[in-house]
Amino acid sequence: GGGQAQEVLESAINYSVANGSVTIAASGNINNNMDFYPASYDQCIAVGAMSPCCERKQGVNSCDAEPGWGSTYGDQIDFVAPGVRIFATAKRAGYWTDFNGTSSACPHVAGIAGLMLSKNPYLNPETIRELLRQGADDIGDLGYDIETGYGKVNAYESILLVPSPVSGDINLDGTVNISDVVILVDEILFGSYITTGDINADGINNISDIMLLIQIILI
């Protein structure tokens, strides 16, 4: 990442999110209030690094013994996650290492998003962002702040908030009704594929899914 926005990258991210991908990016390790891309793009979930003392990782003022860097902050920050001496596997003796930075904080959030999707694969990116917000622990100034965003991500609380999928709820409004049938018919006629419309889980949207959906509504 860096301090310069790139239109082609932003367009790619917007396209990816519009098609259901969750985009999560590290805020950078410059220890200033500044834009850092791609984290500063609106469609990205921007993740900063937290020190072991549950505050934004700073430089010489940090509570840990890592004075050489700090987590970049600003109004683009959504969340913080642990970012100091995070363990990881490595192709070396012992097969492990540890590393610092917002690049070590970011995977925590990506992992939580993956767990949320494993509970309900029909969640869209904005719903995942909102449930992460609701589940986060507010560790900075009350409410949102530019140093820690909405707070420290909390896997347990965010996953608890994930609703179980409802078979046939194509528009994800919590109910199964004629609106879902209309959407499924439209998707089939225009030859596209929507995961929530694949009622029989055979990898395609077709008349069989419509028949099953109608049965669900009538039961």
Positions of the model-derived regions?
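Alpha-helical metal-binding/catalytic segments enriched in His/Glu/Asp
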Residues: 112-120
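Low-complexity, Pro/Thr/Ser/Gly/Ala-rich linker/spacer regions in secreted
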Residues: 156-169
